[in-house]
């Protein structure tokens, strides 16, 4: 976990020096099995959301974007509280609106999406390689460094129990 935090801090430092914004993209954390189409996070998901906030604590996040679904909002909530930010809700399928907002930022952002929306977001940010997020994977942490030639870095982060 210390290695992941160090890795993030290095990339955030590079971003600050080069004035290139960084977009951190994660899939929402584990969801409860009940709750229909809009479930809350499970206890494992809450633990993962708390760990995300801990990892991003000193990352210079100045904006947070979620979708209209509770699971993305609950994943972002601990980071928003820690950073004293109010997340912006963007419709899950409105990739163009989200990317437009990201390109207007003068800072780093956290985007909490879904396994089926993240590949489109990454592509719209200028990353040419295609990615997929397995429906059972909640640990992907993608870092996109914006600029003339955006760069993508793929990491994984555990919940606080280390899963």
Regions found by a protein language model. Give the residues of each.
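Bacterial Sec-dependent N-terminal signal peptides
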Residues: 1-20
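Conserved alpha/beta-hydrolase "nucleophile elbow" surrounding the catalytic nucleophile
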Residues: 114
């Amino acid at each position: 976990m210390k290695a992941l935090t160090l890795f993030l801090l290095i990339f955030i430092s590079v971003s600050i020096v080069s004035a290139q914004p960084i977009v951190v993209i994660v899939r929402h954390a584990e969801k409860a099995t009940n709750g229909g189409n809009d479930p809350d996070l499970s206890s494992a998901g809450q633990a993962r959301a708390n760990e995300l906030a801990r990892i991003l604590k000193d990352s210079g996040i100045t904006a947070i974007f979620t979708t209209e679904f509770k699971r993305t909002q609950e994943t972002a909530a601990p980071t928003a509280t820690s950073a004293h930010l109010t997340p912006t809700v963007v419709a899950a399928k409105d990739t163009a609106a989200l990317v437009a907002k990201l390109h207007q930022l003068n800072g780093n952002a956290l985007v909490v999406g879904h396994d089926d929306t993240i590949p489109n977001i990454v592509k719209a940010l200028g990353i040419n390689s295609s990615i997929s997020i397995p429906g059972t994977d909640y640990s992907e942490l993608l870092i996109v460094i914006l600029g003339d030639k955006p760069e993508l870095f793929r990491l994984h982060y555990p919940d606080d129990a280390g899963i």
